[in-house]
Amino acid sequence: MVFPDLLPRRSTVQPVRLMGDERLRLFSGSANPELAQLVARYLGLAPGPLVRKSFADGELYVQIQESIRGCDVYLVQPTCSPVNDSLMELLILIDACRRASARQITAVLPYYGYARADRKTAGRESITAKLVANLITAAGVDRVLAMDLHSAQIQAYFDIPLDHVYGSPVLLQYIKEKQLGDMVIVSPDVGGVSRARAFAKKLDDAPLAIVDKRRQAPNEVEVMNVIGDVKGKTAILVDDMIDTAGTISEAAKVLLRQGAKEVYACATHAVFSSRAIDRLSDGTFTEVLVTNTIPVPPDRRFPQLRVLSVADLIGEAIWRIHEDSSVSSMFR
């Protein structure tokens, strides 16, 4: 995995003004309208008008309220909680745009739900991440723009063009501005080593550590061991998402017991389900850094939380796709 170099700081980025280009339209699903509004602002647009409602039986209805015939349409809809409703709404939006004769439809997925079901771990299971890709493609989308997919193989689940962008620039920029000094980048499990290593390289090749969780014998509790030196250092735990926060919270406690000075949590997607808020706000972490790919309502926020915006990054990617320019050059 290769992470991009840092983008220009937000204060130095000039919004792309496309108001005069009537071919580009952006619409927001209900999953994260705040992010869609910020992306539209970067592009010098306003999200297109649409009607969305639910019938008494739970069925969804969507109608585009302006002509999009011949337009390049971008639909911003992370498939986050409620996952099934968000996914179904995206499919309906795609179908509505296709039937309205849009020239090209791009699904902008800041967060890709079902991403962890990317392989079979037991017999008679579904590979749901692939199924979701099939559904999105079958609905009529032409292209997908996704951010920080859980695993690289998901890109191959789509038989249409997919542009993969990263939330790491905004996280790295924040950490660099903190000037934390003696840092160690930590993967909370063995599976995330490549992500943590790429993150460390962008921080002047900071040292790397791994929290390895294993059972010493059958029927014994799992034991966490730290591979690497964390004593006296500021530990930064890096992952793609924080869901229940069980693994990352236990990893942080192990790091502190091993002598880490303080621990930061760093992830693109703030899923924050179950007991996540209690675990993240109990004083174990100095700060918890996430982005706004998934909305975090006020009642789910806590003093250690920092929510960083990826709207400019997504907006820049949309502009480059629309102009047939390179997206990958953003990350060189």
Swiss-Prot record:
The cysteines covalently paired via disulfide bonds are none
Cofactor(s), by name: Mg(2+)
Q: In which pathway does it act?
A: Metabolic intermediate biosynthesis; 5-phospho-alpha-D-ribose 1-diphosphate biosynthesis; 5-phospho-alpha-D-ribose 1-diphosphate from D-ribose 5-phosphate (route I): step 1/1
GO molecular function terms listed in the Swiss-Prot or TrEMBL record: ATP binding; kinase activity; magnesium ion binding; ribose phosphate diphosphokinase activity
Binding residues for Mg(2+) 2, per the UniProt record? 189
Which note does the record give on the cofactor? Binds 2 Mg(2+) ions per subunit.
Tell me the domain of life. Answer: Bacteria
Instruction: State the function annotated in the UniProt record.
Output: Involved in the biosynthesis of the central metabolite phospho-alpha-D-ribosyl-1-pyrophosphate (PRPP) via the transfer of pyrophosphoryl group from ATP to 1-hydroxyl of ribose-5-phosphate (Rib-5-P).
Q: What is this protein called?
A: Ribose-phosphate pyrophosphokinase
Q: What is the lineage of its organism?
A: Bacteria, Bacillati, Cyanobacteriota, Cyanophyceae, Gloeobacterales
